[in-house]
Amino acid sequence: MDMVTLGSTGITVNKNGFGALPIQRISQEDAVYLARKAYKAGIRFFDTARAYTDSEVKLGEAFDGIRTEVYIATKTAAQNAEDFWKDLHTSLTNLRTDYIDLYQFHNPAFCPKPGDGSGLYEAMQEAKAKGMIRHIGITNHRLKVAHEAIDSCLYETLQFPFSYISGEQELELVNKCKAANMGFIAMKGLSGGLITNSAAAYAFEAQFDGVLPIWGVQRERELDEFLSYIDNPPRMTDDIRAVIEGDRAELCGEFCRGCGYCMPCPAGIEINNCARMSLLLRRSPSAEHLSPAGQAKMKKIEGCLHCNQCKAKCPYGLDTPALLARNYEDYKRVLAGEVKVQ
């Protein structure tokens, strides 16, 4: 079993974290079942957020009575101290607990610090002093903010996208966190569904002893894949290296990661899927994407207002309107039978 310690927090768990964003899409009963199954199999780290609708409520029911046996991380996207306290109290109620193991600022546009005028970090410190939270973390998609968080020495963990299609800049963050004794939580280990080989994804993450990947799970078969890696963790082999190199050749560069920070779109476009449709058509079953419902979603691209809000919000600096246009043209060719996909 591969284990990881999150820096100075002392939180030590097996190298399979449970990402609870997807369970907001399934029923309470199914979500509770999955979370409990994960716990019974040995997963101990569960990551959610105030922004993930009812995800916290579902975890709260799942761990009622066994709270001290799991580590729960959640997040606040509050922009001021008043909203911070509202979020924290709501999360504690939803999770049926009187403390949160790791409380994280959720993708802020800046790195909260004492004296910055927002009152956010001071609120974190007060919550920790009161025993309402045990450790302070930050999540982000921006390299600048991530580096600032590490350099500040104010945070015990950083959660950032990291997968085998990440580049040298993300790897630098991993190494920098290790040097600072700061835990690194890897989100988007499957790159929003574009990486389809979970064994390769796991083997890559397992190379970094200070990294805890959290896998987004909403189906039992997905959970079972990762549970199988607890006792039989995949290792880097020539075959897995070949898979990784093939995916890097296809996926590296300008493509949508599906993070959703561009949403909502004033024209109603489902940007986080439409802007990567060319990849989804080729890396997942295409029938659903080509259905009447899928066609209706893609057709909304024709109503793009070119307001550039999505471009301004993209943490990866993508020209999102242009990316949408390219994906729509490719989609129409696939739909017309001019281009073949599986």
Where are these regions (language model features)?
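Short catalytic-loop micro-motif centered on adjacent basic/acidic residues
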Residues: 44-49, 73-74, 134-137, 157-161, ...
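N-terminal binding-site loop/beta-alpha segment at the start of enzyme catalytic domains
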Residues: 1-70
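Short hydrophobic/aromatic-enriched beta-strand-loop microsegments
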Residues: 69-72, 155-163, 234-240
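Structured C-terminal cap/extension of enzyme domains
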Residues: 43-44, 172-186, 190-342
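Glycine/proline-rich, positively charged
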Residues: 29, 79-185, 190-193
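Structural motif
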Residues: 37, 41, 94-95, 152-153, ...
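Conserved, mostly hydrophobic/aromatic
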Residues: 6, 18, 46, 59, ...
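Generic structural signal for well-ordered alpha-helices
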Residues: 3, 35, 56, 60, ...
